[in-house]
């Protein structure tokens, strides 16, 4: 089973935000608000889709987590508060932020499903060619990934997600993979220097002009030069 990934590319993340912000159709406006709330709060999709305007009017979101049954309080920064005020100004306090187009038998509204939110994320992943597996946890993980990148406070993030250990948090936000990737960027066990045409010369790297001089020779002469240098190194 593929592990759901955060959005790590800052350019793609910014592009998604800017493009969704310009959407004026109901579906696009819903996707924009859901996306921004997700990456600014780290709430699970199952909690986001149940939010009402009264939950997001102040400086904090206070809600009962569907998964754990615990009360959680999430601070809202000025950016997401401005978005909420702009997009929700005409809503009643008890109105759902993400209502389904369908109605219950008595005519009352209910929220979109997590499956609907997943489908929205798949549309985004396809349109912007996002790397890795994208799903409902992508927004929560994107929040965690960038919160850690900017603040470097793993313990705060662990408490935010209510994880049992910092190691769990690192794996969850994909930073364990990021650290592994960085660790091999300059990793070269044998110290080999690789030149054009796949030739390998151990030891002191050749000067650029010397490398080009050999490269421009035909293959038979290249082989003789490399062979003679290998013999010199063995002496």
Where are these regions (language model features)?
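C-terminal catalytic core of Y-nucleophile DNA break-rejoin enzymes
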Residues: 5-6, 66-85, 96-122
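Basic, Lys/Arg- and aromatic-enriched nucleic-acid-binding interface segment
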Residues: 6, 10-41
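DNA/chromatin major-groove-contacting recognition/catalytic segments
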Residues: 6, 79, 174-230
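Conserved tyrosine-mediated DNA breakage-rejoining catalytic core shared by Y-recombinases
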Residues: 12, 41, 50-82
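Short basic/aromatic active-site micro-motif
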Residues: 30, 131-146
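Alpha-helix N-cap/helix-start motif at helix boundaries, enriched for small hydrophobics
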Residues: 34, 42, 46-50, 157
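Active-site-proximal segment of tyrosine recombinases
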Residues: 47-48, 133-134, 144, 152-163
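Catalytic-site neighborhood detector that most strongly recognizes the C-terminal catalytic loop/helix
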Residues: 67-69, 163-186
């Amino acid at each position: 089973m593929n592990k759901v990934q955060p959005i790590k590319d800052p350019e793609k993340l910014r592009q998604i935000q800017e493009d969704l912000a310009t959407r004026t159709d109901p579906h696009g406006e819903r996707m924009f608000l859901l996306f921004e709330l997700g990456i600014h709060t780290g709430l699970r999709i199952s909690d986001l889709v149940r939010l009402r305007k009264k939950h997001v009017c102040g400086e904090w979101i206070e809600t009962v987590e569907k998964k754990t049954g615990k009360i959680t309080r999430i601070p809202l920064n000025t950016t997401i508060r401005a978005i909420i005020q702009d997009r929700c100004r005409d809503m009643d306090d008890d109105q759902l932020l993400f209502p389904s187009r369908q109605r219950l038998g008595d005519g009352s509204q209910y929220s979109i499903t997590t499956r609907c939110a997943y489908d929205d994320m798949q549309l985004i992943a396809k349109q912007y060619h996002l790397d890795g597996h994208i799903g409902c946890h992508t927004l929560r993980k994107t929040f965690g990934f960038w919160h850690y990148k900017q603040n470097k406070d793993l313990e705060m993030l662990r408490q935010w997600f209510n994880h049992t250990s910092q190691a769990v948090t690192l794996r969850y936000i994909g930073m364990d993979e990021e650290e592994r990737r960085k660790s091999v960027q300059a990793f070269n066990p044998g110290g080999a220097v690789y030149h054009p045409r796949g030739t390998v010369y151990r030891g002191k790297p050749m000067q650029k002009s010397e490398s080009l001089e050999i490269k421009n020779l035909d293959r038979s002469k290249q082989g003789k030069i490399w062979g003679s240098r290998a013999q010199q190194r063995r002496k």
